[in-house]
């Protein structure tokens, strides 16, 4: 049988700060949940709890609708620091 992956237990940074609402306009907090191609990262990588991961997902989708964050980035256009494109 294959060995099971061992994941380090991460703690939700929003629970530690006692955040009740995640605003879609706060791009500095949302960028930790996005990959370099602006895809939403899963819970096991970010360490968010289920409640806050759902809030982050909704906030990112709202930010995409209002054109604060791009939907996707082409492979050709990926830069070293993609969050320079946001400002």
Swiss-Prot record:
Pfam families linked: Ribosomal_S18 (PF01084)
Gene Ontology molecular function, alphabetical: small ribosomal subunit rRNA binding; structural constituent of ribosome
Ribonucleoprotein as UniProt keyword: yes
Keywords, in A-Z order: Ribonucleoprotein, Ribosomal protein, RNA-binding, rRNA-binding
The protein's role, per its UniProt record: Binds as a heterodimer with protein bS6 to the central domain of the 16S rRNA, where it helps stabilize the platform of the 30S subunit.
UniProt-listed HAMAP family: Ribosomal_bS18
Subunit organization: Part of the 30S ribosomal subunit. Forms a tight heterodimer with protein bS6.
Entry protein name: Small ribosomal subunit protein bS18
Source species: Sulfurovum sp. (strain NBC37-1)
Upper lineage: Bacteria, Pseudomonadati, Campylobacterota, Epsilonproteobacteria, Campylobacterales
